[in-house]
Regions:
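Short, small-residue-biased leader/transition segments that mark boundaries at the very start
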Residues: 1-8
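Short, well-ordered beta-strand segments enriched in hydrophobic/aromatic residues
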Residues: 6, 15-23
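Coil-to-beta-strand transition motifs
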Residues: 9-16, 28, 47, 120, ...
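Short, solvent-exposed aromatic-acidic interface loops
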Residues: 20-26, 57-61
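A short, polar/proline- and glycine-enriched secondary-structure boundary/capping micro-motif
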Residues: 26-31, 67, 74-76, 147-149, ...
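A conserved active-site cap/scaffold subdomain adjacent to cofactor or substrate pockets
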Residues: 43-101
Length: 209
């Protein structure tokens, strides 16, 4: 059997998520959260995140196949619409005739983070809404972060009557690379008895003056 917990700590202008897990048999553990963000705010309908400006601290990403499973390749972002090493809006290249964006119907890919050292809490991504000036920074101890641009949102109704059409939210899901058990060269995600899985992800918020 296995046991897992996650602790949410709300601070001034920040949300910290701490994950822990133990097991009595070897098991794969790759925890994350699927929080959706729109820094422009919600409405009916909620606007797309196409104008959000994103930076991701990653030189490589994991390409996917036609059913969104990683192929096992680790590919350079350089020279492709996947490159967010310098700030770009989400919408700038999301509709390019690039096979990876076609497979994902937009961005739905794991970025291989440039880590200072294994397990260090580093800045993974920054997201900014230029109209409101709201900024979100994502820090994590994980090796990767999945960028998802709400490609399959279909107009469902959320809190306060807000509706969410396609691409009206963005996710930064800190995690080990998806499908790691089937890709031996990906970072190991197997938890052994006697060990404890630990992960920290921090979302920091600010408003540009």
């Amino acid at each position: 059997s296995s046991a897992a917990s996650d602790v949410y700590k709300r601070q001034v202008n920040a949300l910290t998520i701490e994950y822990r897990a133990t097991t009595d048999k070897a098991t794969v553990v790759n925890l994350t959260n699927h929080g959706f963000f729109n820094l422009a705010g919600i409405s009916t309908p909620t606007p797309t995140v196409n104008d959000h400006i994103v930076t991701i601290n990653a030189d490589f990403y994991t390409p996917i196949d036609e059913v969104s499973i990683p192929t096992g390749e680790i590919t350079k972002v350089e020279g492709t619409p996947m490159d967010f090493r310098t700030p770009h809006t989400v919408g700038e290249r999301i509709n390019d005739k690039f096979q990876q964006l076609i497979f994902g119907a937009g961005y739905d890919h794991c970025y291989v983070l440039n880590k200072i050292e294994n397990g260090s809490l580093d800045l993974a991504a920054t997201c900014k809404d230029p109209k409101s000036g709201r900024i979100m920074e994502v820090y994590t101890t994980e090796a990767g972060v999945q960028l998802y641009t709400g490609n399959w949102l279909n107009g469902f109704e959320g809190a306060h009557g807000a509706t969410f059409p396609a691409r009206s939210a963005i996710c930064f899901e800190a995690q080990c690379f998806p499908d790691t058990p089937n890709k031996p060269h990906f970072p190991l995600a197997t938890l052994l008895p006697g060990d404890e899985y630990q992960q920290i992800t921090v979302y920091k918020f600010a408003v540009e003056e």
